[in-house]
């Protein structure tokens, strides 16, 4: 039997990373999930990541970085309830260097299980807003990881050039359980429907011509 290549998926609980996980499984990778509690208000996304991993029958590690809330307090509305949540893209929703923090842990995990591949869910519309979703960033981070480990690691965002709507279409074909995914920045029973991430999700489903199986307050 040919041994399958292992890969680490940074699985946030959102639709983009869920599609990456299903894509990797479909490609024949032996998939390992990795998700984070970084002190975010929307802690529900961690539970969603766990459910997606269960659907895929893959292992998942939940890393407690909740003390990062002490660093991000006063900086981002994703961890600080005293900062107003915006409905459009603006500085308060940025968590500084978040992907780099997550990818650093993913590199350590990859080395520990002899995995060469790390994938995360940055997609086409992210790059214009988030520096740590850009190809230049993760290519550079890949080189740093190689220098720091002496291993030929590969870090990739497979859909970094693909609009979110097209990612959702692919996910539907792959059988992604979008009803289990979470996008909202708040920790409510349903998506709030008003935060930037909810609006982004709503627009992507509308553009894809597909129906979002989750419910929103608005």
For each feature predicted by the language model, list its residue ranges.
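ATP-dependent adenylation/nucleotidyltransferase module used to activate substrates
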Residues: 1-175
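Local cysteine-cluster metal-coordination motifs and their immediate loop/turn environment
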Residues: 104, 180-203
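Glycine-rich nucleotide phosphate-binding loop and flanking beta-alpha elements
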Residues: 126, 205-206
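Short amphipathic alpha-helical interaction/hinge segments
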Residues: 149, 206-209
């Amino acid at each position: 039997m040919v041994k399958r290549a292992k890969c680490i998926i940074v699985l946030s609980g959102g639709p983009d990373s869920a599609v990456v996980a299903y894509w990797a499984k479909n490609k024949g990778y032996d998939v390992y999930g990795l998700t984070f509690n970084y002190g975010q208000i929307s802690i529900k996304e961690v539970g969603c990541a766990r459910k997606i991993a269960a659907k895929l029958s893959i292992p998942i590690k939940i890393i407690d970085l909740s003390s990062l809330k002490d660093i991000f307090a006063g900086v981002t509305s994703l961890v600080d309830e005293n900062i107003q949540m915006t409905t459009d893209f603006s500085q308060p929703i940025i968590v500084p260097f978040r992907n780099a923090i997550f990818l650093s842990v993913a590199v350590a995990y990859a080395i520990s299980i002899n995995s060469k591949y790390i994938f995360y869910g940055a997609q086409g519309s992210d790059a214009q807003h988030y520096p740590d979703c850009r190809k230049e960033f993760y290519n550079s981070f890949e080189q740093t990881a190689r220098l720091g480990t002496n291993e030929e690691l590969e870090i990739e965002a497979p859909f970094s050039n693909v609009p979110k709507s097209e990612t959702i279409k692919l996910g539907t074909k792959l059988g992604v359980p979008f009803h289990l995914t979470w996008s909202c920045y708040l920790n409510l029973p349903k998506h709030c429907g008003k935060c930037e991430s909810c609006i982004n999700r709503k627009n992507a489903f509308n553009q894809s011509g597909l129906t979002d199986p989750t419910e929103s307050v608005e």
